[in-house]
From Swiss-Prot:
Organism: Methanothermobacter thermautotrophicus (strain ATCC 29096 / DSM 1053 / JCM 10044 / NBRC 100330 / Delta H) (Methanobacterium thermoautotrophicum)
Role description: Part of ribonuclease P, a protein complex that generates mature tRNA molecules by cleaving their 5'-ends.
Biological processes per GO annotation: tRNA 5'-leader removal
Assembly: Consists of a catalytic RNA component and at least 4-5 protein subunits.
One Pfam family in the UniProt entry: RNase_P_p30
InterPro entries per record: Pol/histidinol_Pase-like (IPR016195), RNase_P_comp-3_arc (IPR023539), RNase_P_p30 (IPR002738)
Localization terms from the record: Cytoplasm
Induction: Constitutively expressed (at protein level).
Keywords: Cytoplasm, Endonuclease, Hydrolase, Nuclease, tRNA processing
Signal sequence bounds: none
Family: Belongs to the eukaryotic/archaeal RNase P protein component 3 family.
SUPFAM superfamilies, alphabetized: PHP domain-like
Protein name: Ribonuclease P protein component 3
Length: 245
C-alpha cells in the first residue's frame, strides 16, 4: 500500500496509465504543474502491469517527493460483476474506481462500502446518473463521485453543455447530501493535465465555489487514501472485521 505520508496539498486523483514510460511522463508533468501526488489508474484487467510499473516509478529519484497511489478501474456489466471485481482487488489497490453510466451499477457502487469512487456516473446518459436515493447511499457509505474534467475539455458544443449541466446537478446533490466529490483530470497524455488553479477556475463554470473545488483536490483525496486501507474490513453498516492479531 501507499506510504503513510499523506500531508500533501494538491492531488490529481485520476491519471490514466498505459505503460511505464507514458505513466512516468504524466507523473513528472503533474509534479511540474504543482501537484504533490496522483493516483495512477489502470483497468482491472491490467493490474499486473500496474503493479510492476508502480514499483519502478516509486523508485524513480525524480518522483521521490511525489506520492503515487495505485488505482484500479472496474468496468462492470452488472452489479454482480462489480461486486466480484471489487472483492478481487480491494486488498490489492489503494483506490477502487467503478466506471459509471449503467444505473444498476451506479446504485451498486453507491451502496458498497468497499468502493472508493464512482467515476462519471452520467456516462452515455442524459441525466446525471445519480438521484436523491443514490446520493444518500453514497454519503452513507462514503463513496466519492468523480467529475473528470476531460469530459468537459474534450467535448464540444451540445455535448459540453450537457456535461456541464450534469456536473451542476451532481454538485447540487453533493451540497444537499454531503457525499465526497472529486475533481480530476483523467489525463491520458501530458496535454490533458491542468494546474490546480486552472481546474478550480474551470469548476466555476458549473457553479463550484473556490473552497469546494480546493477541497475536492486536497482534503477529499487525502481522506479517501487514509480510509482506503480499512475498506476491506467493512462488510455492513456498523460491522467491521477485526484484523488478525
Amino acid at each position: 500500500m501507499i506510504p503513510q505520508r499523506i500531508l500533501m496539498k494538491f492531488f490529481d486523483f485520476h491519471i490514466q496509465g498505459r505503460d511505464h514510460d507514458s505513466s512516468l511522463r504524466l507523473l513528472l508533468e503533474a509534479s511540474r504543474l504543482g501537484y504533490q501526488g496522483g493516483v495512477l489508474v489502470y483497468p482491472s484487467e491490467r493490474y499486473p502491469d500496474l503493479k510492476s510499473d508502480l514499483e519502478s516509478l516509486r523508485e524513480n529519484p525524480e518522483l521521490q517527493d511525489f506520492e503515487i497511489a495505485r488505482g484500479v478501474m472496474i468496468n462492470a456489466s452488472d452489479p454482480r460483476d462489480m461486486r466480484r471485481s471489487v472483492n478481487k482487488f480491494r486488498k490489492k489497490a489503494d483506490v477502487i474506481y467503478v466506471s459509471g453510466g449503467n444505473l444498476k451499477v451506479n446504485r451498486a457502487a453507491c451502496e458498497s462500502r468497499r468502493v472508493d469512487v464512482l467515476s462519471a456516473p452520467y456516462t452515455s446518459r442524459r441525466d446525471p446518473g445519480i438521484n436523491h436515493v443514490l446520493a444518500r447511499e453514497a454519503a452513507r457509505n462514503n463513496v466519492a463521485v468523480e467529475l473528470p474534467l476531460a469530459d468537459v475539455i474534450g467535448s464540444w458544443l451540445k455535448v459540453r453543455a450537457r456535461v456541464l449541466e450534469q456536473f451542476r446537478e451532481i454538485l447540487k446533490l453533493h451540497r444537499k447530501f454531503g457525499f465526497p466529490l472529486l475533481l480530476t483530470s483523467r489525463a491520458s497524455s501530458i496535454y490533458d493535465l491542468r494546474t490546480p488553479g486552472d481546474i478550480m477556475n474551470l469548476a466555476e463554470c458549473f457553479g463550484m465555489e473556490s473552497s469546494e473545488a480546493e477541497e475536492s483536490l486536497t482534503s477529499t483525496p487525502a481522506s479517501i487514501l487514509e480510509d482506503s486501507g480499512n475498506r476491506h474490513l467493512l462488510i455492513a453498516e456498523g460491522v467491521r472485521l477485526l484484523p488478525e492479531s
